[in-house]
Every structure is written in C-alpha cells, then in structure tokens.
Swiss-Prot record:
Lineage, opening ranks: Bacteria, Bacillati, Mycoplasmatota, Mycoplasmoidales, Mycoplasmoidaceae
Protein name per its UniProtKB record: Uncharacterized protein MPN_335
Region (Disordered): 404-473, 555-647
Main location: membrane
Organism: Mycoplasma pneumoniae (strain ATCC 29342 / M129 / Subtype 1) (Mycoplasmoides pneumoniae)
Segments of skewed composition (Polar residues): 424-439
Segments of skewed composition (Basic and acidic residues): 404-423, 445-465, 555-573
Length: 741
C-alpha cells in the first residue's frame, strides 16, 4: 500500500482544503481540552518551582540544584512530561479510534498515511510550543544571578529535553496502545517512566559510591572548589585530594596498600564500584542527562564523595594552593536543603597565628533554614572592602584610645590607694619601733639577749627572702598596650548594622557575611602593606598608620616607665641587702659587750658555746645569701631573654590582626520571629574542624582534577534521536496495521 494514493490529488483544491480543514479541526480540539492545558501547566509549574521559586526563597543557586549528581531535579519533571505526552497523544491519535471519527476519515477522505502525518504535525507543533514556553520560563533564572553561559545551557537543555522526551513517550504510547486500552497504556507508560527516572536516586541509597569503596581500602577522598587569585568571576575546576589514612576495619587492615599515585588509586578502587558500571543499563540516567547538557553535565559537576555517572576522573597535575587560591571550599555536605561551606585561606599573604586559616559560613542546627552564599558572594568587592576596612580601622584606633584612657584612670587609682596604704603602714611601724626601744628589766636580760640574738639571725636569713623579685610582670607590662575587644566589637557591629538597616533579617545576615569576607581581603592587603610595603590601591592605611604610631608611642612610654621602676627596685634591693649585712655583723657584738658588763658571772664554757652557735648561724646566713643570688641571677637571665623576645614581636601588628581574628571568628547572631518558628541565622568565619583541615592542607597534595565523559553528550543526543525516529517508524507501521472497529 502506497503512502499516498493518487499523489496528484493533493494538488487538487478540494483535497487541500480537506487537509487544512482537518488540521484546523484537530488544533481546535486540542485547544478546547482543559486536561491538556492542566498537564502542560504542571510541567511549567514544576520547572518554575525548581528553578525559580525554591532558589528565590532559599537563596540557593538554581543551577546547583538542577545539576546535583544524586538529587536529579529533572527526575521530578520527567513523569509529568510523560503525562503531558500521554494526554496529547490520546487527543490526537487515540480518541478518534474509540469515537468512530477515524473510520469515517479513512473510508471517505484520507489514507492512513496522510492521516498519521497530519496528526503528527499537530502533535509536533503543540509539543514544540510547550518546550518553547518551558525554555522561556527557565530563562528567568538569569535574574537570580546565574551567568549567561549557564543559563543558555539550561534553556537549551530544558527545550531539547521536553521536545525529545515528549516525542519519545508519544511514539511508545502509540505502539503499546495497539495492544492495550487507554487506561492500561497510560498506567504502564507512567509507571515505567517514573521508575526509570528515579533509578539513579534509588540506587544511590542501596549501592556504595566510589568514595566508600576508596575508604574501605584505606583512602580518603576530599572534594574541593576554589576561587582563584585572578579575582575573575569564573570559578575554577574542582580540586581533589586523595589522602592515605588508617583503616579502622580489621578486615581491611589485612590489605597492604601502598600507593602514592592518586590516578592509580582511583582507577583501581573508585571505578570498580558497581554504581559506575550500572551506568550502561541505567535508562533513567540517559533520559535525565538530556536536561543537563554542556556546563550542567555530570563530568563538569562531579563530586568524588557522591555518586556520579558517565565521568572518568583525570588527576592532571599538582596544585600549589599558596600561590593559586584565595578560598578553597570544602563541600562537606551537598544535599538539597543542608549545605555547609568551609573556606581555606592561603598562608602566603596572611600571618599564620593572628588570623584563622579556615573560614566557614554555616547555620547551626540542621532543623533551621540555611543561608548558603553563592561563589559570587565571596568575590573581591573593592568598594565594600574599602568601606568595611575604613570602619574597622577607625573603630580600632578609637577603641585603643578608650582603653588607654581607662587604663590610665585605673593606674592612677591604684597608685593613690597604694600611697594611702603605705602611709598607714609607716605610722604603724613608728609606733612599734618606739615601744621596742624602751629599757628592759634587768632581771630578764638573759632572755632578752637570747631573743635579740635570734632576731638578728632571723633578720639575716630573711633579708634575702624579703628582696623583691627581679623580674616584673611582663604580661601586665605588654598587655596593657591593647584594645578593649568587647567595646570594639559592640561599636563595630553597631556601625555595620546601621549601614544595613531597613533590610530583612535574612538579607542583613547575608550582608554581614559579605562584610566579613570583604574584611578578610582588606586584612590580606593590610598585611602585605605591613610586611612587604605593598600598596594595594584599594584600602586607605591612614587610620592604621595612626594606630601604629600611637601604639608604638604608648609602648615606648611603658618601656621607659618600667625601666625606671626596675632601676628603683634594684637600688632599693641593694640598699636593703647592705643594711641587712651590716645588721648581721654589728648588732651581735654590741649586744655581747652590753651583756658582758651587766653579767660578769658567766663562765668561760658558756661563752665558748655561745660563740660556736653564733658562728654556725652566720655560716647559714651566708649559704642562704649565695642561694638567693643564684636565683636572682637566673631571674635576670629569664627577664633579659623575655625582653629580647618581646622586642622581636610586631606589637602593633599583633594587636591589630588579633582583634580582627577574634571578630572574624566570632559568631554574629540574628533572630527573626516567623509565623511558625523562630529563625536563627549565625554568621561566623571559623570551622570547628580547623585543626583537622589544617593538617590535611599541610600534609597532603592537591591536584587539578578534570572530568571526561565516558559517552559524549553528542552521542547521547544522537542515540535518543535514533531511538525516537525508530519508535516513530514503528508507531507508523503499528498505526497502519491497526484494526478499525
């Protein structure tokens, strides 16, 4: 049977009018079908929900949600595309078979071939229009901050995905409708498509990913993202590190694995995962991949800690993180509504101690709504850097002045109280001395003589003990040149909130986060200026130079004051030592002569015994004095050593950067009373795993890792087209041979 009998009849005006009339009739029937509008609207609504509504409310990157390797958002839309294809196929191809219209048309007007292609044209026009509207909806994601290139890829992916899959499902339905009724055909198609589209998600919960296979064999993969020092808007490729680690499982300890080449490790243990091999028969992944073309594809958005398909990892070359990056993002958790970012600060332009090396933007509590910044939120923003740094520097110097004024007032108060106390002690001492010089009773001369000898001995022993310690309180000496952090933090936070007043709590939290990141960049420039005398041309160092000048001036004043106090203490200590030695040698002789005049009845043996005791006490005093001198010498050496170390400290820089470090790492809390629960937003730039991440960064190597598709996207699209055309031919022959009731 020829496709068109009497082809020349097509040129006949009557035949042409009949074809056009039938074409318009089918279009009108479709337009009047409210069910078809509902299903098409559902497809558009789901696209808007995933790519517009959810990102707008959650402040998440729509492209990140769409290209997630496990939670494939297109899986939610594909079943509704199948439903849309089912409804329109019923309206165009199937319903006429049941209402008797088809037998009328075939027997009196057209051949089945003409009828099939006329209906196919209507089907294609309607599906193309729906695909165009879907792409138009998706193009609105550009208003949410997505780059033009990624939006273009997303629009084309959605357009071709809706178009090809709708045609594919329609052809499948035409074929199976030859054997089943409408209800059975629809249920079979929808059930099969739903199971296929969610195959990847289902397998993700039942099969070990390659990363777990690596861990079982003693290797820990970490996935990183970076922002390069080029300060461009583009985000570089993914970094990955393979870290050889101890295996806690006794079964795995038996395996002696010694490998240093990350490519060999991944090839042996990563790609051997069953999840990788099931890619070849995972039909759901093939149809889902139509919605993630070019920059959205898996081989450009892979994460070694998650499941990914159709991707071969290539460890290209080692990366010098100190020279290449400002931030490296540890993607610890990459789920739909629970994301956590950490940022590694390189050490080549920041002091190791004053500033934290790990920065995190996190919201405490998994049950709370997350605020996750996009990469553009942590880019260098010169106007913001300049503004935040000026506020910070001005607040630093004002806090320093306030603190010094408070310290001066406190010291004056302490000196006044000490003077009053010394005056009171002096009066009490005079009273005691006047009482002790009164004449003693002659009958108690022996007892008094013994007491005087004992007191002179104890005075000689205690003279060294009463000497003030040579080393002063160095922490007090140096720490007084400091900043009152509590007042600084309160003042600085107030200024920042005043700048962002009028915003919602959520937006204010995001702005404060950007301010913290801007301050990080400013501190990096300030450190370059401090250390290398490099002017960035962005920040103004006027306030910082004032702070440094005042800081060093105050430190010099305290140094001179401390030196004067120390010299006075040394002189006083020397006078006390000389007076104590004189008392030890003179007083016993005077007392003995007085005792000899008053009591001449003492025998010679008692005198010799007493002399021997005095000699023994004198030797003990000398020993104690030598010991105290040794201790004093040690104290002097320690003090000199501490002074030398203190001179090497960049004191102004320490105060400045330490204050900045505390503020960067301190949490910034925001509370918002919502309709259902209180929302809490916490902004801080310090990760609890700082030490762990520092060790990872210090002891392991980083590599450029690129993804290479196992099967190219062009091949995938070509295969889907071939399958669709094959099913189209099959549906044509099935339609030709269908019995008419």
């Amino acid at each position: 049977m020829k496709l068109f009998k009497n082809w020349s009849d097509v040129n006949n005006v009557k035949q042409r009018q009949l074809l056009l009339a039938y074409f318009r009739f089918i279009l009108k029937q479709i337009v009047k079908s409210w069910l078809l509008w509902v299903t098409a609207g559902l497809v558009l609504f789901l696209l808007a929900l995933v790519l517009l509504i959810i990102p707008a409310f959650t402040k998440q990157d729509p492209l990140f949600l769409w290209s997630h390797p496990v939670v494939q958002m297109s899986s939610l839309i594909i079943p509704f595309i199948a439903l849309f294809a089912t409804i329109i196929t019923f309206q165009v191809f199937i319903n006429g078979y049941y209402n008797g219209l088809e037998i009328l048309l075939i027997t009196r007007f057209f051949t089945r071939g003409r009828l099939f292609f006329a209906r196919l044209a209507v089907l294609f026009i309607w599906i193309t229009g729906t695909a165009f509207l879907s792409g138009l909806f998706v193009s609105l994601t550009a208003t949410l901050g997505a780059t033009s290139q990624t939006v273009t890829d997303l629009v084309l992916s959605v357009f071709f995905g809706v178009l090809l899959l709708s045609l594919l499902f329609s052809c499948v339905l035409i074929i199976i409708a030859q054997f089943l009724n409408r209800t059975q055909s629809m249920l079979l198609l929808l059930l099969g498509v739903s199971l296929a589209s969610f195959t990847t998600v289902i397998l993700a919960f039942s099969i070990k990913p390659p990363s777990e296979n690596l861990r079982d064999n003693g290797y820990q993969p970490l996935n990183l993202s970076l922002i390069s020092k080029s300060k461009s808007k583009s985000v570089e490729n993914v970094f990955t590190i393979i870290d050889s680690s101890n295996v806690s499982d006794p079964r795995n300890k038996k395996k002696s694995i010694v490998k240093t080449n990350p490519q060999a490790i991944w090839d042996e243990y990563g790609e051997s995962s069953f999840f990788q091999s099931q890619y070849y028969w995972n039909v759901g992944y093939w149809i889902n991949s139509l919605f993630r073309l070019n920059s959205l594809s898996d081989y450009r958005n892979f994460d070694v800690n998650l499941y990914f398909l159709n991707t071969k990892l290539n460890f290209d070359r080692e990366v010098d993180t100190d020279k290449m990056v400002d931030f490296v993002s540890f993607r610890d958790q990459r789920h739909l509504y629970f994301l956590s970012y950490s940022f590694f600060i390189n050490t080549h332009n920041l002091p190791t101690q004053p500033l934290p090396r790990i920065l995190t933007y996190d919201n405490n509590g998994a049950f709370l709504e997350k605020i996750v910044p996009s990469f553009d939120d942590i880019k260098l923003d010169p106007p913001r850097v300049k503004k935040v740094y000026k506020f910070f520097s001005d607040t630093i110097i004002q806090s320093f002045r306030d603190y010094e004024a408070e310290e001066k007032e406190r010291q004056e108060k302490e000196e006044k109280e000490k003077a009053e106390k010394d005056n009171g002690n002096g009066q009490d001492s005079n009273k005691v001395n006047s009482v002790s010089t009164e004449p003693n009773n002659k009958n108690s001369s022996d007892a008094d003589s013994k007491d005087n000898n004992d007191s002179s001995d104890s005075q000689g022993k205690d003279s060294s003990k009463s000497k003030p310690k040579f080393r002063p309180r160095l922490p007090q000496f140096f720490d007084r040149v400091s900043i009152n952090y509590s007042k600084f933090s309160s003042s600085f936070n107030t200024q920042l909130k005043h700048i962002h007043q009028g915003l919602s709590t959520r937006d204010e939290a995001m702005e404060i986060f950007k301010d913290k990141v801007a301050l990080f960049y400013a501190l990096s420039m300030a450190y370059d200026n401090f250390t290398f005398q490099k002017d960035s041309g962005i920040i103004d160092n006027t306030s910082l130079n004032k702070f440094k000048t005042e800081f060093n001036k105050k430190q010099k004043e305290l140094t001179e004051k401390n030196k004067q106090k120390q010299d006075g203490k040394d002189q006083k200590s020397q006078r006390m030592t000389q007076g104590a030695d004189k008392a030890v040698t003179v007083e016993p002789k005077a007392m003995q002569s007085e005792i000899g005049m008053t009591d001449q009845t003492n025998d010679q043996s008692s005198s010799e015994t007493k002399d021997s005791m005095d000699s023994s006490d004198s030797s003990d005093t000398v020993d104690n004095t030598d010991e105290s001198e040794d201790k004093q010498s040690e104290e002097e050496e320690k003090f000199d050593e501490e002074i030398e170390n203190a001179k090497k400290m960049p004191k102004a820089e320490d105060a400045f950067f330490n204050t900045a470090s505390i503020w960067l790492s301190s949490p910034f809390l925001f509370f918002e009373n919502g309709a259902k629960r209180e929302q809490r937003y916490e902004i801080h730039l310090l990760n609890s795993n700082t030490q762990v991440n520092n060790e990872i960064i210090k002891t392991n190597s980083f590599y450029y890792v690129s993804g290479e598709p196992i099967v190219g996207q062009e091949v995938i699209i070509a295969m889907v087209l071939v399958v669709t055309l094959g099913l189209l031919v099959g549906s044509f022959f099935a339609y030709q041979k269908r019995d008419i009731k």
